Amino acid sequence: MHLADLIETTLNGMGYELVELERAPAGLLRVYIDQPETGIVIEDCEKVSRQLTHVLTVENVDYERLEVSSPGLDRPLKKLADYVRFAGAEARVTLRLPVNGQKNFTGILREPTGEAGAEKVGLEFEGKDGPALLEFTVSDVDKARLVPVIDFKGNQRKGNKQ
């Protein structure tokens, strides 16, 4: 079983989602997790770290150090489900190929539309001539992240369907 599949299966069984997996130099394995309904607290990271340590040992995975953390305020958007979940939130999107000479866009995500397998995501942004709409598929994206919203009053992120 591929490492990402092994970790994702383990996390799903625990009620968590694998956001991102990184293999860094010197044997460092970084796992970013989320829990759509409640978010992540330090106890979640500890619990997942203990479980993954056992699973990786049993599966004889070669690594020196394991880090488990939340995806952070600037969470990456990797899957179609991420775009659905964070519709209404502000995001930075970098496309693989330019559209009208531009690859980088910042705006408000719209809920994906279209038939299964051909869904288009919308991003409302401020263009040169006023408000504009960019439509793209998840495969068109080089990288996408939420724009951090820091609210010291404890309100939820706008668009987060939690």
Swiss-Prot record:
PANTHER family (UniProt xref): RIBOSOME MATURATION FACTOR RIMP (PTHR33867:SF1)
Protein name (database record): Ribosome maturation factor RimP
Alphabetical keyword list: Cytoplasm, Ribosome biogenesis
Pfam families: DUF150_C, RimP_N
CDD domains: YlxS_C
Function per UniProt: Required for maturation of 30S ribosomal subunits.
GO term, biological process aspect, one: translation
Family the entry assigns: Belongs to the RimP family.
InterPro entries tied to this protein: Ribosome_maturation_RimP, RimP_C, RimP_C_sf, RimP_N, RimP_N_sf
Source organism, top-level taxon: Bacteria
